[in-house]
Amino acid sequence: SILQKYHPTPDFQQAFKHEKSGNFVMKYASGQALVTLPFFIVGHMWASNSTIYPADGFSFPYHFSVGVGLFLLSLLGMFYLRKVLLVYFKDRTVAALLIIYVIGTNYINYAAVDQAMTHNTLFTIYALLLWMTIRFYIAYESRYAIAIGILTGLATLIRPTEIISILIPIFWGINSISGLKTRIDVIKKQFSKFVLAGIFFGLVAMIQPIYWKIVANEWLGYSYGD
């Protein structure tokens, strides 16, 4: 079996057996799997055309493709963080801040060693979300609203508590009561854009309830099963 061949975990606790359906249900939300899917597909194509590695989802091509893909995703997050910071600070200041961030946090570990963890994926999503929010309040274009909806939905799909990410585009730049009143006026005038963002948020976030419905015949589930 996969467990005996690759020993991916000392104790198979990533899923639990659902009592009513009899199916195994993954404990973790599906967002990270969705993010890694393109890289997994590359690994699968590699393994499927290889005479050395089995196309079983766990051989070297999968590890390599997912690892490199998520490493590049971490770099994308750094790229967009720089773009966000340059809106407010000079280039030298931004360079110093990025260096401090890289050497003073776990960024390198989650970029180059533990890429499959959600930390740097969420880092990149938040960097993109900040950038799309800034652009939205400059141009009020539908494409930015759609991006905001997808990014907040994906963050929630990765870690449900990240639903708080929706507060960023709603309250971004508000630092006074008058600013809050202005934002309310903006929401009224650009209501269709906010609805559009909400629709795409829902489309992405609904992936998790759909998964639960398919495997456990329940729209809402407590995935840890204890």
PLM regions and their residue ranges:
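Membrane-interface catalytic loops of GT-C/OST-like multi-pass glycosylation enzymes that act
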Residues: M26, Y110-N120, I158-P160, K213-D226
